Amino acid sequence: MAEKKKSKLKITLVKSLIGRPETQRRTVRALGLTRMHQTVEQNDVPQIRGMVNRIRHLVKVEEA
């Protein structure tokens, strides 16, 4: 019974949210990011990829 290892994404907030639209702020918060240079690990699923794509100019993404 071989289980597939789920891949993860390391997402780091590198730009400030000051002056950003509310939709971008909500997307960052929904990813679990609350402050600058904070890193979270999320599952690599289409929903998370879509959220990251909307704020790609604010975050740094790495494969975990």
Curated annotation (Swiss-Prot):
Annotated TM spans: none
GO cellular component: cytosolic large ribosomal subunit
Gene3D superfamilies documented for this protein: Ribosomal protein L30, ferredoxin-like fold domain
Ribosomal protein in keyword set: yes
Lineage: superkingdom: Bacteria
Keywords: Ribonucleoprotein, Ribosomal protein
GO BP of this protein: translation
Pfam families: Ribosomal_L30
One example GO MF annotation: structural constituent of ribosome
Protein family per UniProt: Belongs to the universal ribosomal protein uL30 family.
Subunit structure and binding partners: Part of the 50S ribosomal subunit.
The protein's name: Large ribosomal subunit protein uL30
Species this chain originates from: Desulforudis audaxviator (strain MP104C)
Gene: rpmD
